[in-house]
């Protein structure tokens, strides 16, 4: 007999613990994302800020794929989770801070390295909080600005300025403000939509495919400006959502106090 007792429904709905072991495919994507961050740091040290920013954006694309690859191939593991966090710290924490400092913040003296450190420290705090709150946060939203989006704000500004041939020292204070905004927003409780409730395996109307094609075409018009604009909108959207929830009298926190309610089941996996 396979089972001597009937499994409790709440047990079956609880998330499975990540398996122990190391799987090649998802960790290859994670290592590639880590290389993107490392490459960005090297390029910044050599004054190639355009290539440094592209390295961070490439790391963002690869970082968005490793988790999906692991789920699709059923190769999630505790090792992969830890590896992903460490790679994110390099690519979206240390790399953007160093790029911003080398490009513009260096000219502000102590204020420059303080802004760079605040961003880097907030990225570390954001990633640590994400790891410990995974089971209690509504998966439809991020608690605070996600580190890849924060990195996109910092490096996207540098990318668009270098494309326009604007020198870093002339943009020191705007860079200071963006670094602080991105860093501090990472550690707030402001909700940002995660998109994790979108099911890619379900069929979609043909119009959605057309819109995706148009979006790709628009991005290719001028990638630095379009991408920076999109992430600026996203970086402000959390505060709009927070204000709207407050106005409607809804809880603004993404941490649930109960997982027993029917509308909350499955939202914390």
Across the structure, where does each feature detected by a protein language model lie?
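Topogenic membrane-insertion module of multi-pass membrane proteins
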Residues: 1-64, 241, 251, 267-269
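Helix-coil boundary and interhelical linker segments in multi-pass alpha-helical membrane proteins
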Residues: 39-54, 94-114, 156-174, 220-225
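"…together with the soluble PPM/PP2C metallo-phosphatase catalytic core" -> "…together
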Residues: 18-29, 36-49, 54, 104-134, ...
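Juxtamembrane membrane-interface segments at transmembrane alpha-helix termini
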Residues: 64-72, 124-131, 188-189, 239-251
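Short, amphipathic, aromatic/basic-enriched membrane-interface segments that mark the entry/exit
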Residues: 19-27, 79-87, 140-143, 194-204
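C-terminal membrane-associated helical module and adjoining short loops/tails
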Residues: 1-14, 139-269
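Multi-pass membrane catalytic core of lipid/isoprenoid biosynthesis enzymes
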Residues: 22-30, 72-127, 156-159
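Short hydrophobic alpha-helical membrane-embedded segments
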Residues: 27-34, 86-93, 149, 201-212
């Amino acid at each position: 007999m396979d089972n001597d007792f009937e499994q409790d429904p709440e047990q079956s709905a609880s998330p499975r613990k990540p398996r122990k072991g190391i799987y090649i495919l998802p960790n290859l994507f994670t290592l590639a994302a880590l290389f993107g961050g490392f490459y960005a740091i090297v390029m910044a040290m050599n004054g190639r800020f355009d290539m440094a920013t592209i390295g961070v954006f490439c790391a963002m694309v690869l970082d968005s794929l490793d988790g999906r690859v692991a789920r699709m191939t059923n190769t999630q593991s505790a090792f992969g989770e830890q590896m992903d966090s460490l790679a994110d710290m390099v690519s979206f924490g240390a790399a953007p801070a160093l790029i911003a400092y080398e490009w513009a913040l260096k000219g502000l003296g102590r204020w420059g390295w303080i802004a760079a450190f605040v961003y880097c420290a907030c990225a570390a705090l954001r990633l640590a909080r994400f790891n410990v709150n995974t089971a209690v946060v509504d998966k439809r939203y991020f608690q605070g600005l996600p580190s890849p989006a924060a990195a996109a704000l910092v490096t996207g500004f540098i990318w668009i300025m270098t494309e326009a041939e604007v020198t870093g020292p002339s943009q020191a204070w705007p860079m200071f403000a963006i670094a602080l905004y991105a860093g501090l927003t990472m550690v707030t409780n402001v909700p940002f939509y995660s998109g994790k409730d979108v099911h890619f395996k379900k069929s979609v109307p043909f119009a959605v495919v057309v819109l995706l094609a148009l979006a790709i075409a628009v991005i290719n018009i001028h990638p630095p400006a379009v991408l920076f604009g999109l992430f600026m909108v996203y970086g402000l959207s959390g505060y709009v959502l927070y204000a709207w929830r407050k106005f409607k009298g809804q809880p603004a926190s993404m941490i649930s106090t109960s997982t027993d309610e029917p509308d909350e089941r499955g939202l914390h996996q």
